[in-house]
């Protein structure tokens, strides 16, 4: 399995290898043409030397780690500095070298097939499984036209091989990978299932052979298979018990078990919980989506939240589930917290484009969902987030407050996840919009809730103007009958009362509260109204601004002062 390390390979650097430049002429146009031939080439009869060297180095880093892990397992050790160092090397290859070579040679075309590079890596089965995971992921993300039906099936079988290797070994598998890669494996596994679920419902442009192939293979990318993998990883890692002990202040290692003490299983188990949250949300089961996280304390920084994309995905789906469960106050809290986190850490992600694009998209979606939640349940949020929200969706929020259902539906359509049906379609009779049915069903449920609350914003604005008022008179102002107005007042009371998380680990816990700025009761034919709005604490705002000013002042003092000459030249250049 391991790649034999020769003496000259010890300080091997794939980018300094002299053969990297064998095909370069020194003529920029000729060299550009050379690189483009690999970018657009679909089948690689000749693999570039630099790619061969890179794959051999990549294989060596992984096989060396596996050899070291085998030694650690035999010595009954969980990890060591040597393992950590090798994981760091793999992370550098995974996050930097792979992406650089992809941009250079395979921007819109696939990497060489596993069969073509197998001899370069000694037919190492484990490395080839990991390589295929990256190979198919790249096809889904970058290759024009996306994956073929065969590639979708092959990718599924490769995931089966990967998870069988991890789950069905006699003991812990001798493998460790960077947390980022482990998260990407789970994230991509669910994405490809989601993609296939929508693909199989679009039969209009498929040939009879393709439809027959799909009909004869209903178990490929079956929802039960996907759920089984995620639950198996959770159970194998004993992650729920570990989280339970961790949140109560204990040592999770004491209950981790044979597999859970190893980072591979522990992190895959944790990421699988987030995967289950996502999957249940896509299926429209919001209660179960949040329930799988019952041992994760969202409002507390965790030792497990080391991957920013995982953190953001968790908050996006929890916030969306809260919104659909009509727990608006919790949805607002969750969205505001994660948007503040993104706002403060955004510069971290600009180094890697693919991460930045994903985070930027979810950032925009969560702003849209927050705008919906605040329209339906007005409450105070962080000033900086509120300012961003007004800039992005100020006009739409005004239209939503006036009951414009179309704006609600537009924002929901943009910001919601891509829902899917777990059921294999009847290929004999699939109508053209069958793949949109799960979305249309969720949109219908959401729109009905919005329509029930259509009058509440107007009623709230009238209630703020008075302390007492006859029911009949206020009903007249709103052009309603007294009976209809009483019904709307009851709706107001009901909708403004939310189950709100206050304490505890489970995100499903909570107590009924109202954050409405007005409250009222009816005594016979008279409405008695109370303003419950808490006065704005301007002191906190000014203290925050003073701290920001002091921080800016300290930063400016550390900056080197420009000389008079440079200032003079700068002024001259600007003048011209």
Swiss-Prot record:
Biological process per Gene Ontology, one example term: formation of cytoplasmic translation initiation complex
Keywords per UniProt: Cytoplasm, Initiation factor, Protein biosynthesis
Molecular function via GO: translation initiation factor activity
UniProt-annotated location(s): Cytoplasm
Pfam families per the UniProt record, alphabetical: Paf67 (PF10255)
Predominant localisation class: cytoplasm
Record domain PCI: where: 330-536
GO cellular component: eukaryotic 43S preinitiation complex; eukaryotic 48S preinitiation complex; eukaryotic translation initiation factor 3 complex
Family that this chain belongs to: Belongs to the eIF-3 subunit L family.
Annotated function: Component of the eukaryotic translation initiation factor 3 (eIF-3) complex, which is involved in protein synthesis of a specialized repertoire of mRNAs and, together with other initiation factors, stimulates binding of mRNA and methionyl-tRNAi to the 40S ribosome. The eIF-3 complex specifically targets and initiates translation of a subset of mRNAs involved in cell proliferation.
Assembly and binders: Component of the eukaryotic translation initiation factor 3 (eIF-3) complex, which is composed of 13 subunits: eif3a, eif3b, eif3c, eif3d, eif3e, eif3f, eif3g, eif3h, eif3i, eif3j, eif3k, eif3l and eif3m.
Protein name per UniProt: Eukaryotic translation initiation factor 3 subunit L
Organism per entry: Danio rerio
């Amino acid at each position: 399995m391991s790649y034999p390390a020769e003496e000259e390979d010890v300080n091997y650097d794939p980018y300094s290898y002299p053969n990297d430049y064998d095909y370069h002429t020194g003529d920029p146009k000729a060299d550009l043409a050379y690189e483009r031939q690999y970018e657009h080439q679909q089948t690689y009869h000749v693999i570039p030397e630099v790619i061969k060297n890179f794959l051999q180095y990549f294989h060596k880093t992984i096989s060396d780690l596996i050899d070291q892990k085998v030694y650690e397992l035999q010595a009954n050790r969980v990890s060591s500095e040597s393992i950590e160092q090798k994981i760091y090397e793999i992370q550098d290859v995974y996050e930097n070298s792979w992406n650089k070579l992809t941009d250079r040679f395979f921007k819109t075309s696939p990497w060489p097939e596993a069969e073509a590079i197998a001899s370069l890596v000694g037919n190492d089965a484990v490395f080839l499984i990991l390589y295929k995971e990256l190979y198919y992921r790249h096809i889904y993300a970058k290759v024009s036209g996306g994956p073929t039906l065969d590639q979708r099936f092959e990718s599924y079988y490769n995931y089966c091989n990967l998870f069988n290797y991890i789950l069905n070994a006699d003991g812990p598998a001798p493998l460790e990978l960077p947390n980022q890669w482990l998260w990407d494996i789970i994230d991509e596994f669910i994405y490809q299932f989601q993609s296939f679920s929508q693909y199989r419902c679009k039969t209009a442009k498929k040939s009879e052979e393709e439809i027959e192939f799909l009909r004869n293979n209903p178990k490929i990318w079956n929802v039960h298979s996907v759920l089984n993998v995620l639950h198996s990883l959770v159970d194998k890692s004993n992650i729920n018990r570990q989280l339970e002990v961790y949140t109560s202040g204990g040592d999770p290692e004491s209950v981790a078990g044979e597999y859970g003490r190893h980072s591979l299983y522990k992190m895959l188990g944790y990421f699988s919980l987030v995967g289950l949250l996502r999957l249940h949300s896509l299926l429209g089961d919001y209660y179960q989506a949040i329930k799988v996280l019952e041992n994760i304390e969202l409002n507390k920084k965790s030792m497990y939240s080391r991957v920013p994309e995982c953190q953001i995905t968790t908050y996006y789906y929890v916030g969306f589930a809260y919104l659909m469960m009509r727990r608006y106050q919790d949805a607002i809290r969750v969205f505001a917290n994660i948007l503040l986190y993104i706002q403060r850490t955004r510069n971290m992600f600009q180094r890697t484009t693919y991460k930045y694009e994903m985070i930027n998209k979810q950032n925009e979606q969560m702003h849209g969902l927050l705008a919906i939640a605040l329209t339906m349940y007005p409450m105070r949020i962080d000033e900086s987030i509120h300012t961003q929200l007004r800039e992005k969706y100020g006009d739409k929020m005004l239209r939503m407050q006036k009951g414009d259902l179309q704006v609600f539906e537009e924002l929901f359509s943009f910001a919601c996840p891509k829902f899917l049906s777990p059921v294999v379609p009847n290929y004999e009779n699939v109508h053209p919009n069958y793949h949109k049915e799960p979305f249309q069903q969720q949109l219908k449920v959401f729109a009905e809730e919005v329509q029930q609350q259509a009058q509440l914003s107007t009623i709230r604005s009238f209630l703020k103007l008075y302390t007492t008022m006859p029911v009949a008179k206020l009903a007249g102002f709103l052009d309603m009958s007294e009976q209809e107005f009483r019904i709307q007042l009851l709706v107001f009371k009901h909708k403004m009362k939310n189950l709100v998380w206050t304490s505890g680990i489970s995100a499903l816990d909570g107590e009924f509260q109202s954050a409405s700025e007005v409250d009222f009761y009816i005594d016979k034919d008279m409405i008695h109204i109370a303003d419950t709005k808490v006065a704005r604490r301007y002191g906190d705002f000014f203290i925050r601004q003073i701290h920001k000013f002091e921080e800016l002042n300290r930063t400016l003092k550390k900056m080197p002062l420009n000389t008079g000459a440079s200032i003079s030249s700068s002024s001259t250049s600007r003048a011209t």
